[in-house]
Amino acid sequence: MLSLQNRELFPVVTIIIMEAFINKMRRLKGVRKQLIVEEAWKALSSANMAEYLRYMYKTVRKYYGEAIVVTQEVDDIISSPVVKESIINNSDCKILLDQRKYMNKFDQIQALLGLTEKEKGQILSINMANNPSRLYKEVWIGLGGTQSAVYATEVSAEEYLAYTTEETEKVEVYRLAEKLGGDIEAAIRQLAEKRRTKS
C-alpha cells in the first residue's frame, strides 16, 4: 500500500480522495457506502481533514452511508475539538478494546462517550479474566446506549498470522514465504499447522 509521508503530496491526494467519496456518496442511490479512516490521528492532525470528517459524520447517513474512524488512542478524538462532538454524537455503535492504560483517567472518557456505570464496568473488565488455554481477546460493543456487552473474539491460526501486527511474527511469515517462492498463503498454512501441533 502507498504510504503518504510527502508533505506536499498528502494534501493533494487527500482532496482527491475526499472529492471522489463525496461524488460517489451523492451519486450512488440505494447503495451502502462506507468511509473508513484508518490511523485517524494522521487525518485528525490536519484542520482541513478534521473539518471534512465532521462534515462526513453529519452528512453520510442521509446518503445510506457510514463513516468509521479507527484509532488506537482515544486522545486522538478527544484532542480534536472539531471532530470530538460530531464523531461521538453521530456514532450509534462504539467499539472499544482493552482500556486498562486509561484506567486512571477513565472518568473523562466515560463522560465524553456518555457511558453508564454498567458500561464502564464492562469496558474495564476486558481481558481481565481470559481463559489461558484459549487464544482470544475481548472487545466491548455498545449500540446506541440501549445494548452493550463484552465479546470474546477468537480467530483461526491462519487468520491470526495473516493480520498480525507483531513484527517478529510478520518477519517469520515473510521469511518462510521467501523460502517457498513468495507464496505467503503456503507460509501461513505451514506456520499455523506448526502452532497447532505445538499446543
Residue spans of the language-model regions?
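Conserved P-loop NTPase motor module
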Residues: 1, 5-27, 123-199
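Conserved P-loop NTPase motor cores
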Residues: 2-121, 157
